[in-house]
Regions:
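Structured loops at beta-to-helix junctions and adjacent beta-edge loops in soluble globular domains
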Residues: 46, 99-101, 124, 178-179, ...
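Generic detector of low-complexity/intrinsically disordered segments
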Residues: 8-9, 46, 61, 133, ...
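Non-heme Fe(II)/2-oxoglutarate
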Residues: 1-90
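Catalytic core of non-heme Fe(II) oxygenases with the double-stranded beta-helix
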Residues: 90-174
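Catalytic core of Fe(II)/2-oxoglutarate
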Residues: 143-228
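Residues at beta-strand starts and edge strands
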Residues: 5-7, 115-119, 193-197
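Extended hydrophobic/Leu-rich segments
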Residues: 24-28, 35, 74, 78-81, ...
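Generic structural signal for short, solvent-exposed loop/turn connectors between secondary structure elements
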Residues: 1, 14-20, 66-67, 86-95, ...
């Protein structure tokens, strides 16, 4: 298949390591001050009441090329996650973040900056199948940004107006998404924070490994895949 058509698919990778949420929150609070001082994205997100997540960064664009790129000893606190990251098809990680969906909040329709193929996994997921996609009205060559000049782009009006819900082989798993030819959102989280935490991995791809992973994944999880 043409992998440009692939909008969503679970990935043929092991189940992510299990970690303790309270331990994660301790690290979250430690990295908060660092990122507020050094991470422009964190500053922009800080204090936004409408922002549906609490975001933390294990590695960011201004740390990835340092001798030790990990923020606030992430690699010592969660070595099992650092090893898990290595299974993804990147030559160089440039940003690794965690999105902790706020209680009683849905996630509005949006796109992500990794464009064509985005790598994700659920660190925690108590919501089940709440992630949905809508196809773009027509095939796009550039991503429709969620916000332009502090104004929300009504992505629904640029879509085919049909919600396609992602299904997963297990609650906690690795998966990919396409933010060029589809937009996505998440239904409301009725439970306390920590019920749904997504890891977002960005960087420079090893395309040979990427396409090998996509080929294995589509073959294994064809019944779960969403295509344009």
């Amino acid at each position: 298949m043409d992998y440009k058509d692939l909008l969503f698919c679970p990935l043929d990778l092991p189940t992510p390591p299990v970690i303790d949420y309270s331990k994660f929150k301790v690290w979250y609070n430690e990295q908060l001050d660092f990122n507020k001082k050094h991470n422009v994205t964190a500053l922009l997100a800080d204090g936004k009441q409408e922002y549906p997540w609490e975001v933390s960064w294990a590695l960011w664009w201004n740390t990835y090329d340092k001798p030790n790129p990990w923020i606030c000893n992430f690699e010592k606190t969660f070595p099992e996650l650092v090893e898990y990251f290595k299974l993804y098809p990147f030559k160089q990680f440039k940003s690794i973040s965690f999105l902790d969906q706020k209680e009683s909040r849905d996630v509005y329709l949006h796109t992500d900056p990794d464009n064509r193929w985005g790598m994700r996994f659920y660190l925690f997921n108590g919501l089940g199948e709440k992630l949905y996609f809508v196809k773009s009205k027509e095939r796009l060559t550039t991503r429709l940004r969620t916000m332009v000049d502090n104004k929300y782009t009504d992505l629904w009006e640029h879509s085919q107006k049909e919600k396609l819900y992602a299904k997963f082989p297990e609650k906690r798993c690795a998966w990919m998404l396409n933010s060029l030819d589809a937009f996505h959102g998440i239904e409301k989280n009725p439970s306390p924070m920590g019920n749904r935490v997504t890891c977002v991995l960005n960087g420079d791809y090893d395309y040979k490994k990427l396409f090998e992973l996509l080929e294995r994944s589509v073959k294994k999880y064809k019944q779960y895949s969403i295509v344009y």
